[in-house]
């Protein structure tokens, strides 16, 4: 599995969200590259890894990334957070975990109210078969909905998406299956690495309340929460400076 490497300094692995690729992190990469060695992952079926044989499944992807990277902090955005959290819960080489607009459980459950209804993801999976492009555009609009810079962010996401090979329908449906059926809440209870959780105040896909609820499950003495005022589901597009400062401070304090 191909992983782009850039920069110099302490290692940081970045894993993107549904339908995108690692190019989405460009605003962060520009600022972090002078201070960190960045390992930019395109998930299987996405971007530069659109033909990789690695399946889009947590254990296989995490193993492939771990085999190609040194001890590092792992950052996961949205869907990418499931891979980062799984790695943090199972691999000793994960020095720290950054969950960016991501939670251990993306869909609403009886004991997990601050999340999207699973029917929304099911509908996206069905719509992909009928109209791929329209469905992707609708999801990108949800990524930016609520943000104070929604229109600008939407234009950025559309441009970024088309800069590399777009995932096929089967890959996207596999990602939706992960979002709909993965529940890693139990992994938080005994989480060993320190963690930073970043929420967009206006995020409509992963409400800030769900991220706050996740931090309660993790060890309190090793868990930090940052809420980006005015941020949506992709706060690194509109608040790159604030995000970069928070990431660097967190990484600098790791043992």
UniProtKB/Swiss-Prot annotation:
GO biological-process terms attached to the record:
biotin biosynthetic process
Which keywords fit this entry according to its UniProt record?
Biotin biosynthesis, Cytoplasm, Hydrolase, Serine esterase
| EC number(s) stated in the UniProt entry for this protein | 3.1.1.85
Q: What class of enzyme is it?
A: hydrolase
Task: Name any one GO molecular function.
Answer: pimelyl-[acyl-carrier protein] methyl ester esterase activity
Record-annotated active site: 78 (nucleophile), 203, 233
The UniProt entry's GO CC annotations, sorted and at most eight, read: cytoplasm
Its annotated pathway? Answer: Cofactor biosynthesis; biotin biosynthesis
Pfam families reported in the protein's UniProt record: Abhydrolase_1 (PF00561)
Which reaction equations make up its catalytic activity?
6-carboxyhexanoyl-[ACP] methyl ester + H2O = 6-carboxyhexanoyl-[ACP] + methanol + H(+)
- Location in the cell: Cytoplasm
InterPro entries in the record, alphabetically?
AB_hydrolase_1, AB_hydrolase_fold, BioH, Carboxylesterase_BioH
**Keyword Hydrolase recorded:** yes
**Which residues bind substrate per the record?**
18, 78-79, 139-143, 233
Report the function annotation for this chain. Answer: The physiological role of BioH is to remove the methyl group introduced by BioC when the pimeloyl moiety is complete. It allows to synthesize pimeloyl-ACP via the fatty acid synthetic pathway through the hydrolysis of the ester bonds of pimeloyl-ACP esters.
User: Subunit structure, briefly?
Assistant: Monomer.
Q: Which NCBIfam families match?
A: bioH
Tell me its family.
Belongs to the AB hydrolase superfamily. Carboxylesterase BioH family.
Do you know which PANTHER family this protein is assigned to? HYDROLASE ALPHA/BETA FOLD FAMILY, PIMELOYL-[ACYL-CARRIER PROTEIN] METHYL ESTER ESTERASE
Official protein name in the record: Pimeloyl-[acyl-carrier protein] methyl ester esterase
Q: Which organism is it from?
A: Xylella fastidiosa (strain Temecula1 / ATCC 700964)
Question: Gene behind this chain?
Answer: bioH
């Amino acid at each position: 599995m191909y992983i782009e490497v850039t920069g110099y300094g302490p290692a940081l692995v970045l894993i993107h969200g549904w339908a995108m690729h690692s190019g989405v992190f460009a605003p962060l990469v520009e600022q972090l590259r002078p201070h960190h060695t960045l390992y930019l992952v395109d998930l299987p079926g996405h971007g530069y890894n659109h033909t990789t044989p690695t399946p889009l499944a947590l254990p296989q992807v995490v193993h492939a990334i771990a085999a190609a990277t040194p001890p590092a902090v792992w950052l996961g955005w949205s869907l990418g957070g499931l891979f980062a959290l799984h790695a943090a819960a199972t691999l000793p080489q994960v020095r720290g975990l950054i969950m960016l607009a991501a939670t251990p459980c993306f869909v609403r459950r009886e004991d997990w109210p601050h999340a999207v209804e699973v029917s929304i993801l099911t509908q996206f999976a069905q719509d992909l078969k009928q109209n791929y492009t329209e469905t992707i555009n609708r999801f990108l609009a949800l990524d930016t909905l609520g943000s104070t810079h929604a229109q600008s962010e939407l234009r950025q996401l559309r441009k970024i998406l088309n800069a590399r090979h777009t995932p096929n329908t089967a890959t996207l449906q596999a990602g939706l299956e992960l979002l709909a059926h993965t529940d890693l809440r139990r992994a938080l209870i005994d989480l060993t690495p320190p963690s930073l959780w970043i929420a967009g105040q206006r995020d409509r896909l992963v409400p800030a309340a769900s991220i706050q609820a996740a931090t309660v499950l993790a060890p309190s003495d090793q868990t930090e929460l940052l809420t980006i005022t005015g941020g949506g589901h992709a706060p690194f597009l509109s608040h790159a400076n604030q995000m970069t400062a928070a990431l660097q401070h967190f990484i600098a304090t790791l043992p």
